[in-house]
Amino acid sequence: MRLAQLSHESLNFPPPDRALREPNGLLAMGGDLSPQRLLNAYHRGIFPWFAAGDPILWWSPDPRAILLPQHFHLSRSMKRFHQKSPYRVTLNQRFRQVIEGCASDRQEGTWITYEVKLAWQRLHELGHAHSIEVWQDEELVGGMYGLALGQIFCGESMFSQGENASKTALLVFSRYFLQQGGKLIDCQVLNPHTQSLGAQEIPRASYLSYLHSLAFRPLSSECWSPQRLF
């Protein structure tokens, strides 16, 4: 099957079920990272991922990795650590620093290019993208960022420069998101780290059904206000 080439004039995407099986989920290439195109993509279960120097590639893998916040897996060792945690956790206080941390945390190169950083910073300024920060004293030691779609949060990346810092970010955010009425955290593709924290795979069609029913159910406006979570 020929890979769809996106134009700069149209925000349309092919249906996700046209994505390739190998590599799993590759759907289209080209276009741009404008806020409108990114929001259009995520509302359709599509996200960009590409290496520096490559064209923009768009993906919708099958199966899809998700985390139901109420099913976050808290190991006994992590529970003990969290009970005596040296960290505090905040929301939307250092978005730029979090995305820089995620980019620099990749030892073998990163897909978080300058172009990607600018695109996500713009989404943050528009109120769509959000960051969770983990602090030890006044040092930022971990965090995560992603996109809010109603009762769904699309997690993009996380970083850790302190013991269990990224786990702390996801743990605290999962509890907060659930309390605020959040239903699902999109993890895109399953990896050992997110699987250990309770992420699971579901069919792409099931994820698209979640999107259809949850993405346009807004949370309270105060949900994303800069604040301390833990």
Curated annotation (Swiss-Prot):
Origin superkingdom: Bacteria
Task: Write the protein's name.
Answer: Leucyl/phenylalanyl-tRNA--protein transferase
Entry's Gene Ontology BP terms: protein catabolic process
- Enzyme Commission code(s) on record: 2.3.2.6
What's the top EC group for this one? transferase
Function, as annotated: Functions in the N-end rule pathway of protein degradation where it conjugates Leu, Phe and, less efficiently, Met from aminoacyl-tRNAs to the N-termini of proteins containing an N-terminal arginine or lysine.
Note whether Acyltransferase occurs among the keywords. yes
Instruction: Give the originating organism.
Output: Erwinia tasmaniensis (strain DSM 17950 / CFBP 7177 / CIP 109463 / NCPPB 4357 / Et1/99)
**Entry's Gene Ontology molecular function annotations:** leucyl-tRNA--protein transferase activity
